[in-house]
Amino acid sequence: KYEHKKDVTVVEMLPYFMKGVCTANRGYLIYYMQKAGVKLLNCAKLIGLDSGKAIVEQNISKGVPNPYNTWQPILPENIPNPLAKKIGNETKKIEQETDLIVFAVGNKTDDNLYFSAQVANIVPEIYNIGDSSFTGKVLEATRAAERLAVGI
């Protein structure tokens, strides 16, 4: 349990969390999320919402990197790593009970998911922050999430 007796799960579509962030900052944040019991799901995506449940599809092939591994350097896109394992296509669906979902998706404003979930009344509370409401940087989305979390 994290703060307010809530379990926290972070879903990331990319193989690495915080790619492009300074290695020291990335290591520090991932270490403290792990220490606090935050569950990290990389190579995963939210595919649906149903009656208080989030439905996530996660790639579980052997090439998927360990999201808690911070000592392995993340190379830029233009530098090939011949030793990197190829990520396969083996996936599994995970249904997780949720009290609250916070979306921070992409870098192009797209609030369709927010309004669809609101119209369907999927969950009692839903908030529209980050790139879902306006295009910005990760830092801005993180600050918006912190302000929202403090207010909840």
Each predicted region: which residue ranges?
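A Rossmann-like FAD-binding core segment of flavoenzymes
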Residues: Y2-A117
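A conserved FAD-binding loop/helix module that cradles the flavin
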Residues: V21-N25, V119-I152
